[in-house]
Amino acid sequence: MSIFHINVCDLKKSIPDIRVGDEVYLSGTVYTARDAAHKKIRELIENGGVLPFGLDGACIYYSGPTPEKPGQPIGSCGPTTSSRMDVHTPLLMDNGLIAMIGKGPRSPEVIDSIKKHCGIYFCAIGGAGALCARSVKKYEVIAFPELGCESVKKLEIEDFPVICGIDCRGNSIFQKGCI
């Protein structure tokens, strides 16, 4: 297994080199979105609305960070269960999304969409929100502030630790004997 240090803006060209189980340290911009935000983003796409961020080449982190503590840029920001977003993911990938960060397995439809769009799914460490927060350098709420911790946030991250859970060929860390 390999180790990669990748800026999100260069992720698209790096995806074919990454395999299931590879360690990746991401830097750059990611956006948080959970269930409620995904529903709103879906409605915007379906109704021709303006999205709060461009999906082309974007990476969404399935997380609802807590407010920052004194002297820290953000509170805890661990991953949430990704399967809750599966109903929305193919549509978002059809509109340019290439990467997702979360925890747990994905549906066959999401795996097919990852293969179709040469995308990738990363797994972050569940239960380690404080560890994940160490890689966040700054954040801002950019959409749906009424959703509180589930609002869409723009995070600037540095060496955010993830593992490739599903690669662009559709191989999944959740398949028996995959790694």
Task: Indicate where each model-derived feature is located.
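Short, charged beta-turn/beta-strand-edge "cap" motif at the junction between a beta-strand
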Residues: 11-12, 23, 29-33, 168
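Active-site/ligand-binding-proximal alpha/beta "capping" segment
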Residues: 88-89, 163-179
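Feature captures the catalytic cores and cofactor-binding loops of soluble hydro-lyases/lyases
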Residues: 32-33, 37-160
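Short, surface-exposed secondary-structure edge patches
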Residues: 12-17, 52
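Short, structured beta-strand/loop micro-motifs enriched in basic residues and often containing a Trp
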Residues: 1-10
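A short acidic, often aromatic-flanked loop/helix-cap motif at beta-alpha or helix-coil junctions
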Residues: 11-14, 147-151, 171
